[in-house]
Every structure is written in C-alpha cells, then in structure tokens.
Amino acid sequence: MNDSQRVSILSEALPYIQSFSGRKIVIKYGGSVMENDNLKKAFFRDIALLSSVGVCPIVIHGGGPEINNWLKKLEISPKFENGLRITDQKTMDIVEMVLMGRVNKQIVKGVNKTGSLAVGISGLDGNLIQSRELGDGSHGLVGEVTKINPEILDPLISKGYIPIISSIGSTMEGISHNINADFVAGEIAAAINAEKLILLTDTQGILKEKDNKNSLVEKMNLKEARNFIDKKIVTEGMIPKTECCIRALAQGVKAAHIIDGRIEHSLLLEIFTNSGIGTMIVA
C-alpha cells in the first residue's frame, strides 16, 4: 500500500469517525476470531483504535471451544440439543470458571497490551444480567435474559474504560445461567441505547442463497430480515443471530451488523468504510 492509498483510506474513514465519536457500539466477540492468534491480535487492535478515536466499544463474549476443551480435560462429555449446551450444575461450574476466570481475562489482557484500558466483568457483577431458565428448563442451567441493569457500565464508559462482559446471568436468588452471547449482546445494546450492535461470526453475513458466496445482502430492513426467516432463506445458526438483531432494533438500536470475523480488521472495515464488509440491518 502506497502513501496515497493510506491517505485515501483515512479520508474515507473520517466522516464515520466524526459521526460515531462518543457513541456506544456493542460487539459480540466469538467464533474463529477467538481461536486464531492473528485474528485475536487484529481484534484487540481494532477495539483499541475505536476507543482512541472516541467510540465507546462494549465487548460481549462467549467461549464455547474453550469450555469444551476444559470439559474434555475433566473427562466430562459436552452435550448439545438444538445447538444449545445441556448445562447441569457440574457443567455450569466449568462454564463460570472458563468464561469469567480465563476467557474474559485473556481478552482484557489482549486489549490492555495495545495501550487501551479494558475491565473484565460478568453479568453477575452489579446484577448486570438478570436471567431465568430458558423455556421449560430441559436444557438445565441455560438461561435467557429477563432484565439488564446497565448502571454498572456507565462509570466505566464515562472514564474511558472498555467493558469486557462474559455472558453469565443469574436469578435474584443467585442461580447462575449460561446465556447465548448473541442475545446478551443484543439486550445490552438495547439497554444502553447503543448506536450499533455488531456480531462477529464465521459467516460472510446474510446470504440470499445459502451456498452462493456472491449473494451477500449488504443492507436490509427489519421487514426483510423477518421475511428471510419466515421463508427459510436464513437457516440453522443464522436464525438466532438474525432474531437477536431484529429484537435489538425493535428496542431502539439504530443498526445491527452480522460480519465475518475470519477477516482481519473486519470490525473497522464494517464501521469506517463506505462499502462495509457484512450485512447491516436497519429499522
């Protein structure tokens, strides 16, 4: 890349930097980006850059592969049903240990190495994420969000800290739940009136044709997103991600993005370029 191209990129990014300065952007961090060292480093730098230009990033993470690794070490067989982890108390203990004590702190350290200041918390801190058992409770301690109490985030964000949040919630009685990180991100985005919700995934975004990489939908509205689900154009693991975006938008989030986390700096490409890199859904 020559100097002229670098200047052109900065020039293209400037209006977006000005527009989003001081705005909150909630980012769900997951998928391959959590397992590849180069992608992790690029993500940490992207978060640092967002913060340095005045954007307020809030990162929500899961940690499925790391949880599975630790279950294997402890000779516990992971069990899934309809894409959801069956979570008994022994598994929940591992989930809490891995997400809160290991994955969360690895992300915090990665961001802090860039010179930014990240703070790791979970949904238990400050009663941030209140939850209940999902559905009929057949998945055990898998939960769904009942309420977000975002007050704990305000002093962190106002002082320039980057919240890194693990997707564990609890009941008022103190029973912990393992919650899908996409839905946690969507609910937190709505609760803090975020400008954007961005889901990093292992897909390009929403495709018109499942197996056609050239059929990426770059922009769609709520009605179109719902139609894609109803007509089964969106299938399998993309259904909950799309539903999460729809719910966040219905609660006031201005835009939701599903982007390919397998591409280095996809976060910056989506936010700061004219063409973007994934699918943007707007109300």
From Swiss-Prot:
Enzyme class: transferase
UniProt cross-references to InterPro entries, sorted A to Z: AceGlu_kinase-like_sf, AcgluKinase_fam, ArgB, Asp/Glu/Uridylate_kinase, NAGK-C
Swiss-Prot/TrEMBL keywords: Amino-acid biosynthesis, Arginine biosynthesis, ATP-binding, Cytoplasm, Kinase, Nucleotide-binding, Transferase
Keyword DNA repair applies: no
Site entry: Transition state stabilizer: K28, K241
Gene Ontology BP term (one): L-arginine biosynthetic process
Documented EC number(s): 2.7.2.8
Residues reported to bind substrate: G63, G64, R85, N178
Record pathway: Amino-acid biosynthesis; L-arginine biosynthesis; N(2)-acetyl-L-ornithine from L-glutamate: step 2/4
GO annotation, cellular component aspect: cytoplasm
Subcellular location, record wording: Cytoplasm
Catalytic reaction annotation: N-acetyl-L-glutamate + ATP = N-acetyl-L-glutamyl 5-phosphate + ADP
Gene Ontology MF: a single term: ATP binding
UniProt cross-references to Pfam families, sorted A to Z: AA_kinase
Protein family membership: Belongs to the acetylglutamate kinase family. ArgB subfamily.
Function text: Catalyzes the ATP-dependent phosphorylation of N-acetyl-L-glutamate.
Matches recorded under HAMAP family: ArgB (MF_00082)
Protein name: Acetylglutamate kinase
Organism: Prochlorococcus marinus (strain MIT 9312)
Gene (name only): argB
